[in-house]
Amino acid sequence: NRTDVQCQHRWQKVLNPELNKGPWTKEEDQRVIEHVQKYGPKRWSDIAKHLKGRIGKQCRERWHNHLNPEVKKTSWTEEEDRIIYQAHKRLGNRWAEIAKLLPGRTDNAVKNHWNSTMRRKVEQEGYPQESSKAGPPSATTGFQKSSHLMAFAHNPPAGPLPGAGQAPLGSDYPYYHIAEPQNVPGQIPYPVALHINIINVPQPAAAAIQRHYTDEDPEKEKRIKELELLLMSTENELKGQQALPTQNHTANYPGWHSTTVADNTRTSGDNAPVSCLGEHHHCTPSPPVDHGCLPEESASPARCMIVHQSNILDNVKNLLEFAETLQLIDSFLNTSSNHENLNLDNPALTSTPVCGHKMSVTTPFHKDQTFTEYRKMHGGAV
């Protein structure tokens, strides 16, 4: 029941006593490598003719399993085991197709690895389930970013800022960051208060100051209200005098340097002179600032305006002194006049209020008008 070809193959490959079925020697391995380089990895019958007792099948298996430099001889990795599990579950013992999924591994190496270690695990525990690999946890972003923003670090509020129509900011800092030039000028060429809140983010500065005063000293509420009104009028005056540029703030004002403000407001403390109204207008040294009354949370445009707009405060102070001077002159004229007349229709200049006066003499305009009538009545002499 056997054909001639079958008998010939059986004799040449198995039964011939001249066949060498023992281990390969170094000389045989070297000949296989040399003839593979000469004939290529396909002509195994021609290569076997140069190896006594070896057939083409033996040379091919020796090359692909051991001598090929592209074959991996390292230990098996978990990723390769996972691929073998999945492929064997789908393909079974089709080692040649499984080996195509593993570059550098031969079908014989895959089969040996399966039979030696992996098959026992599958028989006892079954195929391992594919565990969903979660991505690495994202790094926390709660670190603080250092910034030199107008000489104080900004802590963003815990809640969202009020105002639903406002566009979200592109960065974590709601203040405009002004680049620091190389040369530090001696003066700040632009009002500090206008540089503070360029993006116009609402800052609860007045509320913070008022809350601080209310908690510690309730008697100062009146002073706080007056301070708020003064700040509002000062800010409106500054906005009306000079419009804020919208682009290229650093290029238009090269003399701006944020560290100068830092030195004047935080390092120097109370006795640091600050130039705040341009290169040609200089303000007097800023008065001492009670830092205990200004908490850290009130670091805002309002606070910087208190520190850097001292010239306007000085003007207001001068107006108050001028008003007191007018009152003193009024009192002097009242006491030195010999023609005092208490007629309710033509009242004399007096610092004492009279209940029957038709007009109040508390304003400079009314004082001037009353004083003019008085001079007309008495012939222009006082």
Swiss-Prot record:
Coiled-coil segments, which residues? Answer: none
A family per Pfam: Myb_DNA-binding
Region Disordered, residue ranges: 119-143
Q: Which PROSITE patterns match?
A: HTH_MYB (PS51294), MYB_LIKE (PS50090)
Query: Where does the record place the region Transcriptional activation domain?
Result: 204-256
Cite a GO CC annotation: host cell nucleus
Look up the DNA-binding region in the UniProt entry and give its residue ranges.
44-67, 95-118
Q: Which region ranges are annotated with the description Negative regulatory domain (incomplete)?
A: 257-376
Domain of life assignment: Viruses
Q: Where is this region: Leucine-zipper?
A: 305-326
GO molecular function annotations of the record: DNA-binding transcription factor activity, RNA polymerase II-specific; RNA polymerase II cis-regulatory region sequence-specific DNA binding
The reply to whether Disulfide bond figures as a keyword in the UniProt entry is no
Where the record annotates domain Myb-like, the positions are: 1-15
Domain HTH myb-type, which positions?
A: 16-71, 72-122
Please state where this protein is localized. Answer: Host nucleus
What is stated about domains?
The absence of the N- and/or C-terminal may prevent homodimer formation, leading to DNA-binding and its increased transactivation activity.
Q: What does this protein do?
A: DNA-binding protein that specifically recognizes the sequence 5'-YAAC[GT]G-3'. The v-Myb oncogene transforms immature myelomonocytic avian cells in culture and induces myeloblastosis (myeloid leukemia) in chickens.
Question: What is the protein's given name?
Answer: Transforming protein Myb
Gene transcribed to yield this protein? V-MYB
